[in-house]
Structure formats: structure tokens, C-alpha cells
């Protein structure tokens, strides 16, 4: 069990290391933090914390740095709340006050904002189509025996599909197909559709032939597992600013990881959209390329349903209190904006 004095020493070491990226010695803690004890006492506490696995000593330094266990204990037990400052508040407010009419643009801007306020690499998953609820289906004639089927969802996510229109199908019948599809699908979540339900719908509307078959085949494809995640990145270049990634091999590994969207989706946990902030630190991520990184994520929603996730990727040595408060603030604003689409 860590006593109160060890807690204070560990918190001081972590916060100093986060600020300076330099190993921390007992004299530094005694001089900069009013702990009310001598450097010798602090040195003894640091030795104990190292023995317990919360600190590590780099080979080339007399100072200590936090271990993975030290960071984990900090975020679970010691991390203070840190309200976002006025400049961050104003940047967030002004971004979401802009008249953004496209969901795609909104998510891209949110990724840029998250990166700008945290100075880390930001990743946001767009609303997942299979998590969305059908709102309306429209059909727009394109000419040359083709039409555009538009699937509109409550999350603002829109899927388009170009379909071939049989020669005998009139404009009125096209509208009837759209109305019938809307009637059968409105209010239903995409992921709750089953192939059995789609086959039943096909039988019921069979007289519309190949046009309907194309629409239902499109929806069946949306039920298939695979590349379902739309990811938006911001501030990848921030990796270059971190002392941890002056090692070219480490940097190359992280940048290579960021190019693999399915791997990024897996680390963000896009298949487990659970409430709240989640922090993964170093070895907890179980990827060699991210051994020196942390990933912090939060979810956003439409109404009472979680529809997507946002997060930052950076060194383990990150300002966790700041990152958590900014993530919560931006997720809240994005959730409010989604209600407008």
C-alpha cells in the first residue's frame, strides 16, 4: 500500500516529468514542490517507489521516470481534475458555433480541434452506419435508366447508392419504392436488420423487381463485418514534436500504425462503444509500435445512443488531466451538434 507521502512524491515526479521530459531527481522535487521533507527523505521514498515498480531509472541518469504502473496508478488514484482554460473554451465554442452543414465536415473539424487543443494526434470515428436509425429513404432519378437511392439516418450519416432502374418503372413508382422502404425501415437500427427481415421485405415488395433487389443487396452488404469504420485524423505531425519520438525507428513504427485504419479502429475500441473516458497506457495496448504511447478515448452520441468515438494518441508522458477535460468538453459539444443533422 502506498502511503500519503509516497503519493505526493509520485504525483510530483509524474507532473514534473510530463512538463520537462527530463528524469526527475530528489533535489528537484524538494526545490519545486512544497512537500515539507528533505531531499534525503524524498530520495528514500523514490527508492521505495522504484522497488514497488512505480518508477524506473534510465541508465544514463540519476533521476527517475514513471513506469507504466506508475502512470496507471496516477490516472486511477492521483490525477486531479483540470478545468479547461478560457482560451481552450473559446476555441471549442467558436468552432462549434460555425454553420457547418455537412456531417463529414463537422467530424473533420472536430478532429482538427481536438488535435489543436491537446497538441496530440487526434482520431475520430464517424458515426457508424450500422449503429444509426433509419429516418428516411429518398430516390432521385439520374437519367439513363439510373436513380440515386439516399438512405438518411438520425445521426446525420447519409449513404448513397446508384441503382439501375428497369425500363417499365415510372417516376411515380420510383417514389412509391422510396415511400415503401421508408415505411418499412423508419425507426429501425441498421444493425438490428437481419437477412430474414430483408428477405421478407423482398417478398412483400417483389413486384418492383431488380430495383428493390439492388437496394436490399446494398443493405445486406452493410450487415457484413469488414471495413465499416470511417476515421478522421488530425495533427499527425504533432508526433514529430515529442522528445520520445526523436528515435526514428520509434517514430516510424507509430506512423506506420496510423496508416492501418483497421488497427487504429481496434485500438480505439470501436467495437465496444461504452460510456465514459478510457485510458490505455503503453504495454496495456499490446502493440509493440505503441509501447511508449498512451491512447485516451471518449464516446459521443445522438440522443441517448452512443454512435462514435474520439481519442488522442501520444506519448505516455502526456497531460492526462488536460486531455480528459478537453475530450469530455469536445465530445459533449459534438453530441449537441449531431442533434441538428
Curated annotation (Swiss-Prot):
Pfam families reported for this sequence: HrcA (PF01628)
Keyword set includes Metal-binding: no
Keyword Repressor recorded: yes
Record-linked Gene3D superfamilies: 3.30.450.40, Heat-inducible transcription repressor hrca homolog, domain 3, Winged helix-like DNA-binding domain superfamily/Winged helix DNA-binding domain
Keyword annotations of the record: Repressor, Stress response, Transcription, Transcription regulation
One of the GO biological process terms: negative regulation of DNA-templated transcription
InterPro entries: GAF-like_dom_sf, HrcA, HrcA_C, WH-like_DNA-bd_sf, WH_DNA-bd_sf, WHTH_transcript_rep_HrcA_IDD
GO molecular function: DNA binding
Cystine pairings recorded for this chain: none
Domain of life where this protein originates: Bacteria
Function in brief: Negative regulator of class I heat shock genes (grpE-dnaK-dnaJ and groELS operons). Prevents heat-shock induction of these operons.
Protein family according to the UniProt entry: Belongs to the HrcA family.
Protein name: Heat-inducible transcription repressor HrcA
Provenance organism: Symbiobacterium thermophilum (strain DSM 24528 / JCM 14929 / IAM 14863 / T)
Upper taxonomic lineage: Bacteria, Bacillati, Bacillota, Clostridia, Eubacteriales
Amino acid at each position: 500500500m502506498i502511503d500519503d507521502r509516497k503519493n505526493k512524491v509520485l504525483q510530483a515526479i509524474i507532473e514534473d516529468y510530463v512538463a520537462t521530459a527530463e528524469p526527475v531527481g530528489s533535489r528537484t522535487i524538494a526545490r519545486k514542490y512544497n512537500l515539507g521533507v528533505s531531499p534525503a527523505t524524498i530520495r528514500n521514498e523514490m527508492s521505495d517507489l522504484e522497488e514497488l515498480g512505480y518508477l524506473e531509472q534510465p541508465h544514463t541518469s540519476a533521476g527517475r521516470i514513471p513506469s507504466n504502473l506508475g502512470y496507471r496508478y496516477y490516472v486511477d488514484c492521483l490525477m486531479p481534475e483540470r478545468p479547461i482554460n478560457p482560451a481552450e473554451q473559446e476555441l471549442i465554442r467558436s468552432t462549434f458555433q460555425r454553420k457547418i452543414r455537412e456531417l463529414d465536415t463537422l467530424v473533420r473539424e472536430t478532429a482538427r480541434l481536438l488535435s489543436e487543443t491537446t497538441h496530440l494526434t487526434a482520431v475520430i470515428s464517424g458515426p457508424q452506419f450500422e449503429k444509426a436509425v433509419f429516418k428516411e429513404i429518398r430516390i432521385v432519378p439520374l437519367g439513363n435508366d439510373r436513380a440515386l437511392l439516399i438512405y438518411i439516418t438520425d445521426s446525420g450519416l447519409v449513404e448513397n447508392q446508384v441503382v439501375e432502374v428497369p425500363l417499365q418503372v415510372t417516376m411515380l413508382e420510383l417514389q412509391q419504392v422510396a415511400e415503401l422502404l421508408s415505411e418499412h425501415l423508419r425507426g429501425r437500427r441498421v444493425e438490428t436488420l437481419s437477412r430474414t427481415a430483408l428477405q421478407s421485405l423482398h417478398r412483400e415488395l417483389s413486384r418492383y423487381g431488380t430495383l428493390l433487389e439492388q437496394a436490399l443487396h446494398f443493405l445486406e452488404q452493410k450487415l457484413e463485418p469488414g471495413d465499416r469504420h470511417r476515421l478522421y485524423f488530425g495533427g499527425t505531425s504533432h508526433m514529430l514534436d515529442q522528445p520520445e519520438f526523436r528515435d526514428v525507428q520509434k517514430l516510424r513504427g507509430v506512423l506506420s500504425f496510423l496508416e492501418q485504419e483497421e488497427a487504429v479502429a481496434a485500438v480505439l475500441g470501436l467495437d465496444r462503444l461504452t460510456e465514459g473516458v478510457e485510458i490505455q497506457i503503453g504495454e496495456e495496448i499490446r502493440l509493440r509500435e505503441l509501447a511508449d504511447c498512451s491512447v485516451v478515448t471518449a464516446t459521443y452520441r445522438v440522443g441517448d445512443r452512443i454512435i462514435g468515438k474520439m481519442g488522442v494518441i501520444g506519448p505516455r508522458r502526456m497531460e492526462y488531466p488536460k486531455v480528459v477535460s478537453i475530450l469530455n468538453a469536445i465530445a459533449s459539444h459534438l453530441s449537441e451538434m449531431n442533434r441538428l443533422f
